[in-house]
Amino acid sequence: MAPTVRRPVPADAAAMARVHVDTWLETYRGIMPDKLLDAPDFIDRRRQMWTNILTEAAPSAFICAAAEHDGEIVGIAMSGPPQNDGEPAGGGTEALRPEDRHLYVLYAYRSVHGTGVGQDLLDAVLDPSATTALWVADPNPRAQAFYAKNGFVADGTVKTDEYDGVREVRMVRPGRA
């Protein structure tokens, strides 16, 4: 049976933190510094983050989803208000608008890659009519191909993340009417 996607509840925070940390370990070893990935408080910081998001965040500000398989959370996603770094979106001249979205999180265990869970999570947290931006690690060809398949295009904006030192490429998907 394929994973099912649902809205998470505060009791899911610890499991979502575990998915967040485990998928970073699966995906980013060799891309992110080991000291960050191996930090003893890494899981605690992610647990606190998800607890805050699921209990304190303005309900309309963030949309979260959890994919569940056999009673276990195997994937997570979250979108929210745009990060407006003052850079034009999509190679144009307009910056992202407040009604646009930013995809902050989309992670799933490797064991469920290819099941459609990534697509289901993406669809659960994004409105196709909203212009959406995201930052994706570079290199991360699997993720970049997935986003390209979903209409995201690299807009030429590149940065090095201050938190983890990873080179990231911004991808933008124009809203559809």
Label the model's feature ranges.
Residues P3, P10, V21-G30, D38-H113, ...:
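Acetyl-CoA-dependent GNAT
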Residues G165-A177:
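Terminal substrate-recognition subdomain of acyl/acetyltransferases
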Residues M16, H20:
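Hydrophobic pocket/interface hotspot
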Residues Q119-D120, P139-G156, Y163-V166:
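Conserved active-site alpha-helix within GNAT-family acetyltransferase domains
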Residues P128-P139:
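Conserved GNAT acetyl-CoA-binding A-motif
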Residues V9-D12, N140:
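Acidic/polar helix N-cap motif
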